């Protein structure tokens, strides 16, 4: 693709380290949108980031703890640019987190971290996220957006962040128009990408699930 002047840009809810592990280090040569669009890079150079505040991060962490105390089987992943932090270390939770976070660290108390570079907090629910933990967390943090990124995952993040916003920043940087952009998506967290492209392909069965 590159030889034909086409820039391939993976846009994912996964962390940058995980995308490198899955797609190879060659992704650093072009545009990349990790963490649901909370930051973007071209050629390994960061173009933008949309972190949450420390106060917001603490509220989300406390909300997840409260869901757990009420019987919800949930766990939080505090995602920064390069490392994801967790409190839960049981095998069941770790096996889910390791799929998407290649660079991670377990800590005793997430609120003891600096929390000055939190892009998002991903919440894994062993039940159905949108039915169980999602609505409870949404009530506690109305100033943040909660995005369903899978049957079991909810991403809590800045209200301005999205894959669509990240793509628009990359397009402006590269001088690429929506007419020159094709988008391929498979879940609800891909929807805003379609606003930035005139060519798109969606897997509707998955988008509606």
Locate the predicted segments by residue.
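Conserved small/polar residues in nucleotide/adenosyl-binding loops
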Residues: 202-209
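Short active-site oxyanion
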Residues: 4-9, 28-30, 120, 179-181, ...
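Short, acidic/turn-prone active-site loops that include or flank metal/cofactor-
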Residues: 36-38, 151, 205
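Active-site phosphate-binding/coordination module
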Residues: 2-93
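Conserved acidic, metal-coordinating active-site core of Asp-based
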Residues: 67, 71-184, 188-196
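Short beta-strand scaffold positions
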Residues: 10, 34, 183-185, 202
